[in-house]
Amino acid sequence: MINVLLVDDHELVRAGIRRILEDIKGIKVAGELCCGEDAVKWCRTNSANVVLMDMNMPGIGGLEATRKIARTFVDTKVIMLTVHTENPLPAKVMQAGAAGYLSKGAAPQEVVNAIRSVFAGQRYIASDIAQQMALSQIEPEKNESPFASLSERELQIMLMITKGQKVNEISEQLNLSPKTVNSYRYRMFSKLNIHGDVELTHLAIRHGLCNAETLLSQ
């Protein structure tokens, strides 16, 4: 039996995935959570073979939660299931320790195939995303995102900023000092040739790393 943990801050999304999986022989939904912090805590006291993880959630988010789970619970495989498929997110997520990467537009059977593949010790990347990653290696000048220059930590902080989180919130959730968070911010601004959080959010929207509604809600 493959025990699966669903982690997404939208109950409707979790319900849809649960309906897909509950009729699949050999797969069981072992739990449902709405944030990355709770996923890490859950894994300390419960057993999941596979975690289906959303990227953008309140708190530390899917990228940081994936990194923590992959490093601490080596037998638990994480599949990122997200609307964000643009470079450099897939590569950064896989580097953080994810075993798979899927778009939320994936067909139900592909989700099942991904779960079975990572449980068997393989990596699974949706074909369209894998093609995009390959093209970015073959023709980097045409396909590389300006965000590709960011480190994993910088990318995580960027995603939190574009959700409207402030420096103090980010420092508390990532267990960093506000000074350290600001150092990451200014390093990002320098790499991206921008001057503030609003410009950062606009740039992230243009490159498909966050939704336009994010800016409107700030």
Spans of model-derived segments:
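Short, flexible helix-to-coil linker/hinge segments that flank and couple to helix-turn-helix
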Residues: 88-95, 100-152, 156, 206-212
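Helix-turn-helix DNA-binding segment
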Residues: 144-179
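Active-site residues of response regulator receiver
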Residues: 54, 82
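Acidic catalytic/metal-coordinating carboxylates
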Residues: 35-38, 60-64
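Active-site beta3 strand of CheY-like receiver
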Residues: 47-52
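Receiver (REC) domain active-site loop signature in two-component systems and cognate sites
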Residues: 57
